[in-house]
Amino acid sequence: MNKLNITYHPEYDIPVPPKHRFVGTKFSDLFSYLQSQTYFLKFQVTQPQRASKERLLRAHSLSYVDKIYEESLSDNDLKKINLPWSTQLRNRSFLAIEGTYQAAKLALNYGIACHVGGGTHHAHHEYGFGFCIFNDLAYTALNLIEEG
Protein backbone atom coordinates (compact mmCIF):
# COMPACT_ATOMS: atom_id res chain seq x y z
CA MET A 1 0.00 0.00 0.00
CA ASN A 2 1.30 3.46 -0.91
CA LYS A 3 1.67 6.01 1.83
CA LEU A 4 -0.17 9.33 1.79
CA ASN A 5 2.26 12.19 1.22
CA ILE A 6 2.05 14.93 3.85
CA THR A 7 4.09 18.11 3.43
CA TYR A 8 5.04 19.92 6.64
CA HIS A 9 7.87 21.96 8.12
CA PRO A 10 8.47 22.64 11.83
CA GLU A 11 9.17 26.30 11.02
CA TYR A 12 5.55 26.95 9.99
CA ASP A 13 4.59 28.36 13.39
CA ILE A 14 4.83 32.10 13.95
CA PRO A 15 4.67 34.29 17.06
CA VAL A 16 1.43 36.22 17.42
CA PRO A 17 -0.09 38.04 20.42
CA PRO A 18 -2.22 35.79 22.68
CA LYS A 19 -5.57 37.31 21.65
CA HIS A 20 -4.82 37.54 17.92
CA ARG A 21 -7.36 35.98 15.53
CA PHE A 22 -4.63 33.97 13.81
CA VAL A 23 -3.44 30.98 15.83
CA GLY A 24 0.33 30.98 15.33
CA THR A 25 0.73 27.33 16.33
CA LYS A 26 -2.13 25.88 14.30
CA PHE A 27 0.18 24.10 11.87
CA SER A 28 2.23 22.29 14.51
CA ASP A 29 -0.96 21.66 16.50
CA LEU A 30 -2.47 19.87 13.51
CA PHE A 31 0.72 17.97 12.77
CA SER A 32 1.02 16.89 16.42
CA TYR A 33 -2.58 15.69 16.33
CA LEU A 34 -1.89 13.67 13.17
CA GLN A 35 1.21 12.15 14.79
CA SER A 36 -0.90 10.99 17.73
CA GLN A 37 -3.23 8.97 15.49
CA THR A 38 -2.62 5.33 14.60
CA TYR A 39 -3.11 6.09 10.90
CA PHE A 40 -0.05 8.38 10.97
CA LEU A 41 2.00 5.30 10.08
CA LYS A 42 0.35 5.47 6.65
CA PHE A 43 1.83 8.94 6.01
CA GLN A 44 5.06 9.81 4.27
CA VAL A 45 6.18 13.22 5.57
CA THR A 46 8.22 15.52 3.34
CA GLN A 47 9.65 18.95 4.12
CA PRO A 48 9.72 21.79 1.61
CA GLN A 49 12.77 23.90 0.87
CA ARG A 50 12.52 27.69 0.75
CA ALA A 51 10.99 29.09 -2.43
CA SER A 52 13.48 30.66 -4.81
CA LYS A 53 13.19 34.27 -5.90
CA GLU A 54 12.92 33.18 -9.53
CA ARG A 55 9.87 31.05 -8.78
CA LEU A 56 8.30 33.70 -6.52
CA LEU A 57 8.48 36.23 -9.35
CA ARG A 58 6.06 34.13 -11.39
CA ALA A 59 3.31 35.07 -8.93
CA HIS A 60 4.51 38.29 -7.28
CA SER A 61 6.14 41.55 -8.34
CA LEU A 62 9.87 42.12 -7.92
CA SER A 63 9.30 45.15 -5.70
CA TYR A 64 7.05 43.18 -3.36
CA VAL A 65 9.31 40.12 -3.21
CA ASP A 66 12.27 42.39 -2.46
CA LYS A 67 10.34 43.95 0.44
CA ILE A 68 9.93 40.48 1.93
CA TYR A 69 13.58 39.52 1.39
CA GLU A 70 14.74 42.81 2.91
CA GLU A 71 12.09 42.80 5.66
CA SER A 72 11.13 46.34 4.66
CA LEU A 73 7.32 46.24 4.57
CA SER A 74 5.60 49.52 5.35
CA ASP A 75 3.05 49.95 8.13
CA ASN A 76 0.36 49.97 5.44
CA ASP A 77 1.68 46.69 4.02
CA LEU A 78 1.57 45.10 7.47
CA LYS A 79 -1.92 46.43 8.12
CA LYS A 80 -3.17 44.58 5.02
CA ILE A 81 -1.48 41.36 6.12
CA ASN A 82 -2.78 41.74 9.69
CA LEU A 83 0.07 39.77 11.26
CA PRO A 84 2.93 41.11 13.36
CA TRP A 85 6.14 41.03 11.34
CA SER A 86 8.87 38.65 12.44
CA THR A 87 11.74 36.79 10.87
CA GLN A 88 9.79 33.61 11.63
CA LEU A 89 6.87 34.91 9.52
CA ARG A 90 9.27 35.70 6.68
CA ASN A 91 10.87 32.24 6.84
CA ARG A 92 7.51 30.50 7.16
CA SER A 93 6.26 32.30 4.07
CA PHE A 94 9.16 31.08 1.91
CA LEU A 95 8.66 27.52 3.17
CA ALA A 96 4.87 27.30 3.08
CA ILE A 97 4.47 28.55 -0.47
CA GLU A 98 6.89 25.89 -1.66
CA GLY A 99 5.08 23.33 0.50
CA THR A 100 1.86 23.85 -1.44
CA TYR A 101 3.77 23.48 -4.71
CA GLN A 102 5.48 20.33 -3.43
CA ALA A 103 2.16 18.82 -2.33
CA ALA A 104 0.67 19.55 -5.75
CA LYS A 105 3.59 17.85 -7.49
CA LEU A 106 3.22 14.84 -5.19
CA ALA A 107 -0.53 14.72 -5.88
CA LEU A 108 0.12 14.75 -9.62
CA ASN A 109 2.55 11.85 -9.23
CA TYR A 110 0.66 9.76 -6.65
CA GLY A 111 -2.98 10.83 -6.96
CA ILE A 112 -3.25 12.57 -3.59
CA ALA A 113 -1.15 14.59 -1.14
CA CYS A 114 -1.77 17.05 1.68
CA HIS A 115 -0.03 20.19 2.85
CA VAL A 116 -0.34 20.92 6.56
CA GLY A 117 0.64 24.60 6.10
CA GLY A 118 -1.20 25.70 2.97
CA GLY A 119 -4.08 28.05 2.37
CA THR A 120 -2.18 31.31 2.00
CA HIS A 121 -4.16 32.36 -1.05
CA HIS A 122 -5.32 35.88 -0.11
CA ALA A 123 -2.10 37.66 -1.09
CA HIS A 124 -2.08 39.73 -4.29
CA HIS A 125 0.62 40.22 -6.92
CA GLU A 126 1.86 43.48 -5.33
CA TYR A 127 1.00 42.99 -1.66
CA GLY A 128 0.09 40.55 1.07
CA PHE A 129 -3.41 40.39 2.49
CA GLY A 130 -5.52 38.57 5.08
CA PHE A 131 -2.76 36.72 7.00
CA CYS A 132 -1.01 35.82 3.73
CA ILE A 133 2.42 37.05 2.62
CA PHE A 134 2.44 35.13 -0.66
CA ASN A 135 -0.33 33.48 -2.68
CA ASP A 136 0.42 29.77 -2.58
CA LEU A 137 -2.26 28.79 -5.09
CA ALA A 138 -1.14 31.31 -7.73
CA TYR A 139 2.51 30.39 -7.09
CA THR A 140 1.76 26.69 -7.47
CA ALA A 141 -0.38 27.03 -10.59
CA LEU A 142 2.02 29.39 -12.37
CA ASN A 143 5.05 27.27 -11.56
CA LEU A 144 3.33 24.05 -12.63
CA ILE A 145 2.37 25.69 -15.93
CA GLU A 146 5.87 27.09 -16.46
CA GLU A 147 7.52 23.77 -15.73
CA GLY A 148 5.11 21.80 -17.88
Where are the language model's segments positioned?
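HDAC/HDAC-like amidohydrolase catalytic core signature
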Residues: 1-148
